[in-house]
Curated annotation (Swiss-Prot):
InterPro entries: Ribosomal_uS15, Ribosomal_uS15_bac-type, uS15_NS1_RNA-bd_sf
Protein's gene: rpsO
Source domain of life: Bacteria
Organism (species): Corynebacterium jeikeium (strain K411)
Compositional bias per record (Basic and acidic residues), positions renumbered to this chain: 1-21
Keyword Transmembrane (UniProt): no
Subunit structure: Part of the 30S ribosomal subunit. Forms a bridge to the 50S subunit in the 70S ribosome, contacting the 23S rRNA.
Protein name, as recorded: Small ribosomal subunit protein uS15
NCBIfam families on file: S15_bact
Region feature Disordered, mapped onto this chain: 1-22
Database matches in SMART domains: Ribosomal_S15
UniProt keyword annotations, A-Z: Ribonucleoprotein, Ribosomal protein, RNA-binding, rRNA-binding
Family named by the database record: Belongs to the universal ribosomal protein uS15 family.
A biological process from GO: translation
Length: 89
């Protein structure tokens, strides 16, 4: 369920601070969100795939921590990001 190179590059161009940015919280959160959405779709059809469900929960927890970090350090960037990603918060 990994992201293809094209998906990753496109996501980083849209949400990264620059084209090759992979370390900023925005870029990491965006990549995690894309992976979470892919796994969510997978689990709709494979309800008994508990190993993938656990992986999904780990990704959600990692994203939650990064969102908390961003909210504490720069509220404007946080609000902009959740609006662009369409996250509920």
């Amino acid at each position: 369920m990994a992201l293809s190179k094209e998906q990753k590059t496109e996501t980083l161009k849209e949400f990264g601070l620059h084209e090759t940015d992979t370390g900023s919280p925005e870029a990491q959160i965006a990549l995690l969100t894309v992976r979470i959405r892919q796994l969510t779709e997978h689990l709709k059809y494979h309800k008994h795939d508990h190993h993938s469900r656990r992986g999904l929960l780990l990704l959600v927890g990692r994203r939650k921590g990064l969102l908390k970090y961003l909210a504490e350090n720069n509220v404007d960037r946080y609000r902009s990001l959740i609006e662009r990603l369409g996250l509920r918060r």
